Amino acid sequence: MVGTAAADDPPPRRRVVRDPVHDYVEVPGELEGLVASAAVQRLRNISQNARANRRYPSLTGFRYEHALGTMHLAVAGWESAWRTCEDDVRSRFAREVISDVRAAPELDPCTAAWVSGKEVEDTPMWPEFARVIGLAVAAVGLLHDVGHPPFSHVLERFYQERIVAVMGADAALDQAEYAALSGQAQFHEWAGLQIFDTLPDECFRHLPRSLVRLILSDRSGDDWTDCLHSVIDGQFDVDRLDYLMRDSRRAGTELGSIDWRRLVHSLELHQVPDGWRIGLGARAISAFETLLVQRAQHYRWVIHHPAAVVADAALTRCTEGIFDLACSPPHTEGSDGADRAALADLRSVVPDLDYVHSAVRFDAGVGVCRDDADLLAWLRASRRPLTALADSGSPELRGRARRLLRLHDVCDGFALEPVAAWRNYHEYLERAAQNPDVVAALIEQAPLAKTPSFLVSAASREAAALMLTELPARLNGALDELLGDDDHVGAREVEAWLSATTPHVDGLGEGFWLIQPVGFLAVRDEFATVWRGDMESPLSAVSPFPLALTAIEVMRPHCYAYFVPFGTPPLHHDKETRRAVGDAFFHAIADSPAATGDPA
């Protein structure tokens, strides 16, 4: 073993872990220190699918088992790509990797030992290249989600928007610089690098830390670091492959029926003019089509199930609302001493939310929010002061507290299910048909949606242009225009308008609204590609599936609207109740400032 470990201190023996998806996952001995670290063990308590168990009770998996599965598939994918390429390609790739690592300004002792030598061929890494890269790729697969906050993607926006209050101005500046330089805006990727850099050296006693860091962090294009990173996060990646199979098994659906062996064993390493790529060979087209279809169906029926969407939305609003109320000025018009005492109580239970700097410690201590359980404990501890504020003499405090208590009922314990204006494509069209004048006015005011820029081929763009003239697509375009950009700012503004102007729905009484866009899950031509020899082609050039899936995405509802009653709603929402909510939504939104262009 090359590195800092002594010859009489070899790495631990490999360990085999039982897994419901892959049967057995092999953990290389060199990764045992990393697996046992506090940062990776924290993932045992970070849910994979947030509150999707609202509708799928057994969908209770955590990021830890997904990290092990991704590690397992990453090694298999790398080994396949290395095995299937020609000797001269292997030689050029290994030479470039070792040369670049040797030229790095700083290297940890283990990496430095691997690349030491007068010439590239003299380095200990040269004959062990495939194994060393396999270990590095395995480590990246294991660590790829280590930066997720409690409840994963659902609370990423909360942490990013309040990073100064939660982590300080320096962290905010560093995160902004990372996003600008890398082109990656995902908060958890920045957080993962922060956690990686604070992991103790003991975790990397038998691993080339600097090499792992290069692969984990680089998103620069087609060089070898991005090429290796793409095994975990790329056009076809083992991250997506593992979570589709794992989530499907837990949810009890058939949507994980994917020939993963065919896919992984079809990975190929190619040299391109600007660098290197790892992608799927054409022999995997049928398996790739199945993967894309199952992915689209998984999002449609599981991730974007209206009950799961509203539970996640309620968790986000509840967390944001409690934190913002606790941080608000102590004096509010109409408040009294009891209100100030309740606000003080609310502030006193807010934990240290900086999970990034506590992730590497097992002994983070009381009052630190590192995972899902900590966050739920905080929300539950907030109920007592919120209940006191719900009787406040201040209309503002009383209204905010009442909404937060109802949101907590939705997202924790599932004591309340808001009423959706529509639950599926059929009901979406029904609501449009029931409100033809309003829908026609909304569509008329909105520009015709543009053909998605990610469709490269002329056939795809022409077909998409025809789809965009259909009613569901036109209505989606109108609502997309009203609800604004990817930050969901427009959705929040419309939500506030609806709650202020339409606080009552027949049959449900008084309440408030939640509006939640659901992302456009496209099959992008530049990412869905296959290799035929040395030629890379868009999948849409050899398969009709990308266009068919784009059609589904263009036509399906792009948002959900919910009414949250303050009273007790019917146990089961019938069609008439949902119709009443849908009618109220369309009539109110037609008069909103976003629709009319008038100032609020």
Which residues make up each language-model segment?
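Histidine-centered, transition-metal-coordinating active-site segments
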Residues: 1-139, 148-600
